[in-house]
A protein has these predicted regions:
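Exported/periplasmic ABC-transporter solute-binding proteins
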Residues: 18-52, 56, 60, 65, ...
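Short active-site-proximal "capping" loops at secondary-structure junctions
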Residues: 62-68, 86-89, 109
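Generic beta-strand structural signal
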Residues: 100, 109, 137-139
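Bacterial N-terminal signal peptides
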Residues: 7-14
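Short, solvent-exposed loop/turn segments at the edges of secondary structure
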Residues: 11, 106-107, 254
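Positively charged n-region of N-terminal signal peptides that target proteins for export
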Residues: 1-4
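Short beta-strand-centered segments that line the small-molecule binding cleft or hinge
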Residues: 74, 78-85, 89-103
Length: 298
């Protein structure tokens, strides 16, 4: 049923809304979105507001799981929820708070670092694990219970453990530098720029947007290749669910971002119009410029 809603509702509702967008009135649009979407969404917001005087887009970045819990636990209204993982919308919002999601962009996990990172002249895609585990190296990651990049970082460790045949790599890495776990991946950028940490697990797009150096990881572990779906799903972990005492199991999948218009949207018509702009050729170009390959849904 969810697959049916994924394909039918976005195409019928959004396509109709895009064709009739000229009648949409001025309004305020509240957008809860993944932190890694901050740069492209600010650019989309600026262009849209210039072309639609009187419209104000309010962007609220957070970890995608936190965005979802604003709706499910805090009962906050938003017009668009944009997640770094379709899983968040499908598992935490459907069917009680939304009934469809549409995927619009991809990404990949990299190891990003700053100019003064220790051993930056040595690190590569084959030895990054050994570098990050050195006693004098500090690395950061985001919180798996708050942010998809956080649980994807752990999934990458798990896949690396198998790929490189390094027993207990995940245990060693997750027990190290726990003071440098942050609510969302973009919070780590300031730690890199201030030299508080040497390296971080990060999305490639965020590294590009902030002019950071990064090591690309093999496709077998970076969660970028849909053809490796069977391999990715061999890694899994439990994260917090909708309630503090609940957990949900998340498995490795290739990275894809999705968005929806929740049932509690106040300005649904304008939300459809802005979403159509995000999904347009121009909107897709903005994602491409910012290091993310767009998914063209129609």
């Amino acid at each position: 049923m969810r697959q049916f809603l994924f394909y039918f509702i976005p195409f019928s509702v959004l396509f109709s809304g895009c064709r009739n967008s000229g009648n949409v009135k001025s309004a305020e649009i509240i957008v809860f979105h993944a932190g890694s979407l901050s740069v492209p969404f600010r650019q989309l917001k600026d262009i849209y507001e210039q072309r639609n005087p009187g419209v104000k887009i309010l962007l609220e970045p957070a970890g995608s799981l936190v965005c979802a819990r604003k709706i499910t636990e805090l009962k906050k209204a938003c017009d668009i929820m944009a997640s770094a993982d379709y899983f968040v919308i499908n598992e935490l919002l459907m069917p009680d708070y939304a009934n469809w999601s549409i995927r619009f962009a991809t990404n990949e996990i990299v190891i990003a670092y700053g100019e003064k990172a220790k051993y930056s002249t040595e690190i590569n895609s084959a030895n990054w694990m050994e570098i990050l585990l050195r006693a004098d190296v500090i690395y950061g990651r985001s919180d798996p219970d708050a942010d998809p990049c956080g649980y994807r970082s752990v999934l990458t460790m798990m896949l690396a453990e198998s790929h490189y045949k390094l027993p207990d790599l995940t245990g060693k890495m997750t027990s190290k530098n726990r003071d440098y776990i942050r609510p969302k991946e973009v919070d780590l950028v300031a730690l890199i720029e201030s030299n508080a940490i040497d390296y971080m697990f990060q999305y490639k797009s965020v590294a590009i947007q902030h002019n950071l150096k990064y090591i690309e990881l093999p496709e077998e572990i970076n969660l970028s290749d849909p053809s490796k779906a069977d391999l990715y799903k061999t890694a899994s972990l439990d994260i917090r669910g909708n309630k503090p005492d609940e957990t949900i199991r998340v498995s490795g999948e290739y990275i894809n971002y999705s968005m929806t218009i929740p049932f509690n949207a106040v300005n649904r018509e304008r939300a459809v119009d802005f979403m159509c702009f995000i999904l347009s050729e121009e909107g897709s170009g903005i994602f491409k410029t910012n290091g993310q390959d767009p998914i063209i849904p129609f």
